[in-house]
């Protein structure tokens, strides 16, 4: 339970810090709507009654925990109340919902937005004659069409050396030794012209290899090795169909049986606690609900800015109200309920808000 409370406090503190940094340069028009002011005024009484069960306690640490818990209760209850009162989306339409953009004029298909410059010779993509070559297009659209003559093949290239040089082909080096092959080639049979390749060096054929004795194993396996087939099936060695004197003693292994499932044994004095699910406060769903109420309307940057300004003001005022009402001496339950409503209204709508100054 303490971990959940600590997680909620951390989440709301980080969110309020980001919101305060975002709303430093924000204008006051996001919370000066008279309709929204009436809704917040009506909701503060309900919020004060809901969160007034939190009583003050002695000690600075306990007091800070109470302040954070009360601030979270104020913010969450305020947004719940706003959502309950705005079942009709038209109530906050001037603040949240933006009108759609005007429709664009229809495009005339006869108007070419980017005409081609004149004196351009068109070519078909595959080199064939296109319709432009047959003069089947409107000359006023593309300008004057200049047909080009076909490209004729020219004479073959001829290498012309510099004056005083002779083109001599690269001669073959003499004394080429042909490599012997497994089969006898024509060079071994002396069926080539020796004057063409120069002095040929004929190598004698390799001596034939001695026959291989099948009973001799060049690399014997060490003893006490249990062979396995590559696919896990039983091979001939498992059936004892080989010569035991060649491979040594074959020791068959028993099959591996599946063991019991693993069990996590914690250290003495510790308890295995599953990782808690992340706490998502109700305030996170407020923007989604407000934006998803009217899918046919345009949602752009001003809409997000106004929503962020509104949530920032409510978040900051929740902390200010909690700090103001809980630090007063000898605060009882009835006094706390009476303190929440005027403190919340004064923070959200201070006297300078009508003149355009920021609330905090």
From Swiss-Prot:
Cystines in this chain: none
Signal peptide boundaries: 1-23
Alphabetically ordered keywords of this record: Nodulation, Signal
Description of what induces expression: During nodulation in legume roots after Rhizobium infection.
Superkingdom field: Eukaryota
InterPro entries in the cross-refs: Nodulin (IPR003387)
Disordered: annotated segments: 123-148, 228-249
One Gene Ontology biological process: nodulation
Family, as annotated: Belongs to the nodulin 20 family.
Name of the featured protein: Nodulin-44
Lineage: Eukaryota, Viridiplantae, Streptophyta, Embryophyta, Tracheophyta
